[in-house]
Curated annotation (Swiss-Prot):
The keyword DNA-binding is annotated on this UniProt entry: yes
Compartments reported by the entry: Cytoplasm
Binding annotation for Mg(2+) 1: 8, 139
EC number: 3.1.21.10
Source organism (scientific name): Photobacterium profundum (strain SS9)
Database matches in PANTHER family: CROSSOVER JUNCTION ENDODEOXYRIBONUCLEASE RUVC
Enzyme class, broadest EC rank: hydrolase
Name the UniProt record assigns to this protein: Crossover junction endodeoxyribonuclease RuvC
Taxonomic lineage of the native organism: Bacteria, Pseudomonadati, Pseudomonadota, Gammaproteobacteria, Vibrionales
Reaction catalysed by this enzyme: Endonucleolytic cleavage at a junction such as a reciprocal single-stranded crossover between two homologous DNA duplexes (Holliday junction)
Positions with a binding annotation for Mg(2+) 2: 67
PROSITE patterns assigned: RUVC (PS01321)
Record: active site: 8, 67, 139
The protein's assembly and partners: Homodimer which binds Holliday junction (HJ) DNA. The HJ becomes 2-fold symmetrical on binding to RuvC with unstacked arms; it has a different conformation from HJ DNA in complex with RuvA. In the full resolvosome a probable DNA-RuvA(4)-RuvB(12)-RuvC(2) complex forms which resolves the HJ.
Assigned keywords, A-Z: Cytoplasm, DNA damage, DNA recombination, DNA repair, DNA-binding, Endonuclease, Hydrolase, Magnesium, Metal-binding, Nuclease
């Protein structure tokens, strides 16, 4: 049994999703959003760190998975996203959790079957895979998708290599 915490980072809203993996079965444990109220970036980062730390304390995950930064047209937004990721990662590392990172396209591929899926498709498949009665908030659904991707990808890596290792896993430890 493995409890996986997935994070969809954002400087204003950071989604989190927690699932339990038992063999091939995935079970929903919880999800939500950490909403920052601070106007300055340092204040937001502090709130993200505190929020992720609280989720870790509440759910006691075994592993932590987070979406990588996507570089769009706005470099400033990408930098803020990177800072939010860093804040969440530090919370995980301080709790001695192994950290895994996944590109957005890989997450969509693992959950929906295509790397070009839109948010509605991701939400639908997250509900289907985890047998949720209703749609979670968009950022929480994305975080659950990160956790599902980790469950599927990590399982495949173990099967292929015969051990729990990955080029990116645990590089922050």
């Amino acid at each position: 049994m493995t409890i996986i915490l997935g994070i969809d980072p954002g400087s204003r809203i950071t989604g989190y999703g927690v699932i339990r993996q038992v063999g091939r079965n995935l079970e929903y444990l919880g999800s939500g959003c950490i909403r920052t109220s601070a106007e300055d970036i340092p204040g937001r980062l502090k709130q993200i760190y505190a929020g992720v730390s609280e989720v870790i304390t509440q759910f006691q995950p075994d592993t932590f998975a987070i979406e990588e930064v996507f570089m769009g047209k706005n470099a400033s937004s990408a930098l803020k996203l990177g800072q939010a990721r860093g804040s969440a990662i530090v919370a995980a590392v301080n709790a001695d959790l192994p950290v895994s990172e996944y590109a957005a396209r890989l997450i969509k591929q693992a959950v929906v079957g295509t790397g070009a899926a839109d948010k509605a498709q991701v939400q639908h498949m997250v509900c289907s895979v985890l047998k949720l009665p209703g749609k979670p908030q968009a950022d929480a659904a994305d975080a659950l998708a990160v956790a599902i991707c980790h469950a599927h990808t990590h399982k495949t890596l173990i099967a292929m290599s015969g051990k729990a290792s990955s080029a990116r896993r645990g590089r922050y430890r």
